[in-house]
C-alpha cells in the first residue's frame, strides 16, 4: 500500500493547505505541479502523484502584489514600472519553452511574460545569487516578475518532469486570501 503524499513538514501552513486540496481533488489533472510560496520565497516541485521532487529558495518580482498589470508582458523591460514588477498569484498551466535568448524556461504564462527559470546573473548590484541564499524573504524580491531558481533545482525537478503536456503552477498570494485566488472549491481545507 502506497503512502499518502504529504507536503514538506517545514512548509508554511498555506503550502500545507493548498497541497492537501490539490492532491485530494486531483486539481493538478495528473500532471506534475509546483507550489510557489511568495511570502517565504520558497518553491516546491511535486510529481503528479504529489511526491516531493525538491524545494528551493526563489527570487520573485520586486513589487509585493498578486495582480498582473495588463500589457506588462508586451513592454520592454526598461518600460516596466517598479510597482508593475509583481509575480502574479494564481493557478497556471505551465509549459516548457524558450525565452528570447534561446534558454529553456517554464512559461507560467507566456502572454504575461512570467516564467520560472534558472537564476540570471543580473547586474553586480542585483547580487542575485547572494539574495537567493538569504534567509530573509524580503531579500528575494528583485526580478521583473519571473521566478528565478537555482540551476540544480530547475534541471532536476522542473525540466525533466514538465516535458510534453507541462504541469500546474500554484502561486500563493502575498496579500489576498487563498480562497480569493483559488476559489472555494480548491480551498476546502483552507477555510
Task: Please provide the spans of the model-predicted regions.
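N-terminal secretory targeting signals
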Residues: 1-21, 184-191
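Exported/periplasmic cell-wall-interacting domains
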Residues: 85-191
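Residue-level detector of alpha-helix boundaries and kinks
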Residues: 3, 7, 28, 138-142
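Soluble non-cytosolic domains of exported or imported proteins
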Residues: 9-13, 30-33, 37, 144-148, ...
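Gly/Pro-biased beta-strand-loop elements
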Residues: 14-32, 36-127
Amino acid at each position: 500500500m502506497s503512502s499518502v503524499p504529504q507536503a514538506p513538514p517545514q512548509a508554511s501552513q498555506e503550502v500545507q493547505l493548498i497541497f492537501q486540496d490539490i492532491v485530494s481533488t486531483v486539481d493538478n489533472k495528473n500532471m506534475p505541479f509546483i507550489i510557489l510560496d511568495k511570502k517565504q520565497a520558497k518553491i516546491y516541485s511535486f510529481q503528479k502523484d504529489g511526491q516531493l521532487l525538491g524545494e528551493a529558495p526563489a527570487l520573485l518580482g520586486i513589487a509585493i502584489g498578486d495582480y498582473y498589470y495588463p500589457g506588462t508582458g508586451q513592454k520592454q523591460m526598461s518600460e516596466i514600472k517598479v510597482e508593475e514588477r509583481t509575480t502574479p498569484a494564481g493557478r497556471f498551466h505551465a509549459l516548457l519553452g524558450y525565452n528570447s535568448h534561446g534558454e529553456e524556461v517554464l512559461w507560467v504564462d507566456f502572454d504575461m511574460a512570467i516564467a520560472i527559470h534558472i537564476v540570471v546573473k543580473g547586474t553586480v548590484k542585483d547580487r542575485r545569487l547572494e539574495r537567493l541564499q538569504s534567509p530573509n524573504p524580503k531579500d528575494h524580491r528583485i526580478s521583473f516578475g519571473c521566478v528565478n531558481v537555482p540551476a540544480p533545482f530547475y534541471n532536476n525537478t522542473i525540466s525533466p518532469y514538465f516535458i510534453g503536456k507541462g504541469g500546474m503552477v500554484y502561486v500563493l498570494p502575498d496579500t489576498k486570501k487563498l480562497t480569493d485566488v483559488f476559489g472555494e472549491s480548491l480551498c476546502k481545507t483552507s477555510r
